[in-house]
């Protein structure tokens, strides 16, 4: 089993990376493989709403971190998406990354029925609002959202300050253990012949105005 930690910060080794490492260390201790994917600091174009992905099965915008991520995403059994807080929300690059990665993937089963978690980091405030943004992609995509003993956030203005947020560190550690447990439960269920929930046939999309 493997989990992919997605670092949505423009700083490769900043506070978000530190938070993800605490999660990852617990996963490794439980025998779960871990890799980290950094979305980078180069601009990522946002979704244009062209719906070409519905025809092509992939986003028309290519050659960036979204394409690179989707090329490997199928290999993983779970995901942790992290972002720093910019103006009480996730970074602009992370928003563009998440929107395109998830929306262009709707016709495939990369994410459905896999566990996922989200984490945020900030100097002071805005973490809960940013968490809610990330959670939307998880909840929409039929994933099993993993929680901890508090909202999944750490605080610090620099990477070395995250360790001083002792409660935040424990929240990340608990999250890692919970993620490992869910992964093992899914594996045990599969081995015991317990199937994952069957999809609803003939999915309906109802517009509010028609």
Regions found by a protein language model. Give the residues of each.
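N-terminal beta1-alpha1 ligand-phosphate binding loop
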Residues: 2-30
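Cysteine-centered iron-sulfur cluster-binding motifs in ferredoxin-type domains/subunits
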Residues: 7-8, 12-17, 45-54, 77
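A short beta-strand-loop structural module common to alpha/beta enzyme folds
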Residues: 32-42
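Cysteine-cluster motifs in flexible loop/terminal segments that predominantly coordinate metals
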Residues: 42-74, 204-210
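Helix-loop-strand module that forms the ligand-binding subsite of alpha/beta enzymes
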Residues: 58-150
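Glycine-rich phosphate/pyrophosphate-binding loop and the adjoining helix
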Residues: 144-210
């Amino acid at each position: 089993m493997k989990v992919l930690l997605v670092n949505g910060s423009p700083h490769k080794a900043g506070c978000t990376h530190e938070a993800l490492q605490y999660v990852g260390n617990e996963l490794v201790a439980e025998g779960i493989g871990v890799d980290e994917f950094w979305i980078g600091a180069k601009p990522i174009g946002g979704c244009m709403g062209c719906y070409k992905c519905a025809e092509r099965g992939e986003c028309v915008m290519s050659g960036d971190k979204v394409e690179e991520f989707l090329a490997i995403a199928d290999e993983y059994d779970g995901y942790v998406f992290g972002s720093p807080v910019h103006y009480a929300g996730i970074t602009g690059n992370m928003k563009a990354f998440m929107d395109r990665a998830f929306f262009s993937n709707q016709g495939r089963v990369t994410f459905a029925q896999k566990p996922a978690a989200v984490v945020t980091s900030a100097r002071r405030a805005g973490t809960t609002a940013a968490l809610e943004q990330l959670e939307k992609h998880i909840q929409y995509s039929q994933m099993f959202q993993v929680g901890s003993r508090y909202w999944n956030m750490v605080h610090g203005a620099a990477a070395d300050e995250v360790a001083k947020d002792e409660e935040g560190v424990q929240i990340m550690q608990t999250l890692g253990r919970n993620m490992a447990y869910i992964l093992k439960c899914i594996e045990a269920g599969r081995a015991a012949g317990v199937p994952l929930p069957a999809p609803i046939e003939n999915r309906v999309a109802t517009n509010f105005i028609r």
